From Swiss-Prot:
This is Set1 complex component swd2. One of its GO terms (biological process) is transcription initiation-coupled chromatin remodeling. It comes from Schizosaccharomyces pombe (strain 972 / ATCC 24843) (Fission yeast). The keyword Metal-binding does not apply. Its main location: nucleus. WD repeats lie at residues 24-65, 110-149, 199-241, 247-289. Pfam families: WD40. Component of the Set1 complex composed of ash2, sdc1, set1, shg1, spp1, swd1, swd2 and swd3. InterPro entries: Swd2/WDR82, WD40/YVTN_repeat-like_dom_sf, WD40_repeat_dom_sf, WD40_rpt. It is found in: Nucleus. The Set1 complex specifically methylates 'Lys-4' of histone H3. The keyword Repeat applies. Keywords: Nucleus, Repeat, WD repeat. Belongs to the WD repeat SWD2 family.
Length: 357
């Protein structure tokens, strides 16, 4: 969790303080990740490199080349000197890289098509990978062998909750979220949540839990992102997104262009190539009624009506924040938006990385 108190005034006053771009970099950034300390930011790039940045000093640290295999979905392990990433060339192997030596420590083969998501467990040395080959795999960093395999009916993305005990998968074609117990990885999901509010042919880019476990954020390659109740699957918030997708080696790359703050109270999205929008998440009040959970929603701040599961309304942003307010900063398309989980700091990216404080 963040070590600094998060408030509306603090977030709405954020400005882009530093714009960083490797002078030799000519591609685009496709994903961002932070190490456990929050001091390092990792960017995966279309020029087959992984770029490291220091979040404290706001400086470029180093570039790690992966010219043979390509790089996407780079994620730090629980050690700042190692990371894993998906391959965009050769095959669809997930690779384990030593940041200091730029040498691979281990390979995780098995996926037959493009890897769509990678998520490291917050609890231990395991991680999930999902793929267009309709599988989800569970791995242990200490072994190249797959620890668990789920065959699903359509391409999915997957993510752990904050405890590492539960993970969610979202199916594009089945329009549902499936919740699994990590201790029974190969078993059927303990809950399936239909996503009846999703429009036809929506493309899911990413799924993530809020840190308090109450919300699930679905970012898409279509016109909207969705915040849903992690217990009931009800649509709580629908916000517009106009970030384009990019075709890479014949495959579409979808950006994680929205994120929640570490206190689970605010949502940030990229909107129109020059601005970020900030929304307040609806408060979930849970009361136990017999053997099930009943959720009631209370409006907060300036939020408008909360959509029900069949609603098609959207929320108005609490604040619209320009992505460039300084003459020293070049305008950037904020196609990726991530919140540093340890500090009150936003990071956005496209062809470079912008630090907001």
């Amino acid at each position: 969790m963040t070590t600094v108190s998060i408030t509306f005034d603090l977030l709405s006053s954020m400005q882009p303080r530093k714009w960083l771009k490797n002078q030799n970099f000519v591609g685009e950034i496709t994903s961002l990740s932070f190490d456990d300390s929050g001091e390092l930011c990792l960017a995966s790039c279309t020029d087959d490199t992984l770029q490291l940045y220091n979040c404290i000093s706001g400086k470029f640290v180093k570039s790690l080349a992966s010219k043979k295999y390509g790089a996407h979905l780079g994620r730090f392990t629980h050690h700042s000197n190692s990371l894993i990433h998906a391959s965009t060339k050769e095959d669809n192997t997930v690779r384990y890289l030593d940041v200091v030596t730029n040498r691979y420590l281990r390979y995780f083969p098995g996926h037959k098509q493009t890897v769509t998501s990678i998520d490291v467990s917050p609890a231990d040395e395991t991680f999930l990978s999902a793929s267009l080959d309709n599988t989800i795999r569970l791995w242990d960093l200490r072994s190249p062998n797959c620890q668990g395999l789920l065959n699903v009916s359509s391409p999915v993305v997957a993510a752990f909750d904050a405890t590492g005990l539960i993970f969610a998968s979202v199916s594009e074609r089945k329009y549902k979220i499936s919740l699994y117990n990590i201790k029974s990885f190969d078993a059927r999901p303990f809950q399936d949540i239909p996503l009846t509010f999703l429009p036809p042919h929506v493309r899911i880019a990413n799924v993530e839990f809020s840190t308090d476990g109450k919300y699930l954020l679905l970012t898409t390659g279509n016109d909207f992102h969705y915040v849903i109740d992690a217990y009931s699957g009800s649509e709580l918030l629908r916000v517009p997104s106009k970030v384009s997708t990019k075709t890479q080696d014949g495959n579409l790359t979808y950006y994680a262009s929205a994120c929640m703050s570490p206190d689970s109270k605010f949502l940030f999205t990229s909107y129109d190539n020059e601005h970020l929008c900030m929304y307040q998440l609806p408060e979930l009040k849970q009361t136990v009624n017999s053997d099930h959970i009943v959720n009631s929603f209370t409006e907060m701040g300036l939020a408008s009506t909360t959509p029900t599961s069949n609603s098609h309304s959207t929320e108005n942003p609490l604040a619209i924040i320009p992505s460039s307010t300084s003459k020293n900063l070049l305008p950037e398309t904020p196609s990726i938006v991530r919140f540093n989980p340890r500090f009150s700091q936003l990071v956005t990216a496209h062809s470079g990385v912008i630090f907001w404080t």
